């Protein structure tokens, strides 16, 4: 399963729930697959989607907030996981797409083959799940509908050579439409 296939499945299952999406190819794929006003695309802030997602979850306790992170992104900001685990937002679902690569910056390897991200998440009070194929991912997405967070879902994906188009919406417009979507 590649990133785009995983994003298609997840967005189909979660509907219009808000998504804070990390920078790079992840945001491009989400934009291509399912652009909506409830998506907040990180255009350039590597490693900060989880921190922003936490703030959004705290201020919007009645909405389920999804964070889409890459393995490279979360490894840059592991401290956010300890903060999330301490605050324990019941409405936060942290999805980490793991291809063992900083794919957006040239494909350099991350340490995710050596570092057990789900054990780190579990040690800081997340409920953890791992999906390595579409069937398992769909099963987990159905299961977590009735779970409270924080939830950590690692999705093992393959690298891809297909690069999505750049997001053609001004970052100010992305912010404005996302903010409006939260008050509706």
Mark where each language-model region is.
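Conserved active-site and cofactor/substrate-binding residues in soluble primary-metabolism enzymes
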Residues: 1-5, 25, 47, 51, ...
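Active-site diphosphate/adenylate-binding microenvironment
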Residues: 1-46
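A short acidic, amphipathic alpha-helical/loop segment
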Residues: 9, 80-84, 140-143
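Short beta-strand segments
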Residues: 20-22, 68-69, 94-98, 154-158
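Thiamine diphosphate
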Residues: 31-98
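Glycine/aspartate-rich loop-and-adjacent alpha/beta segment that forms the canonical ThDP
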Residues: 36, 146-184
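Long, charge-dense
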Residues: 99-107
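Conserved thiamine diphosphate
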Residues: 108-143
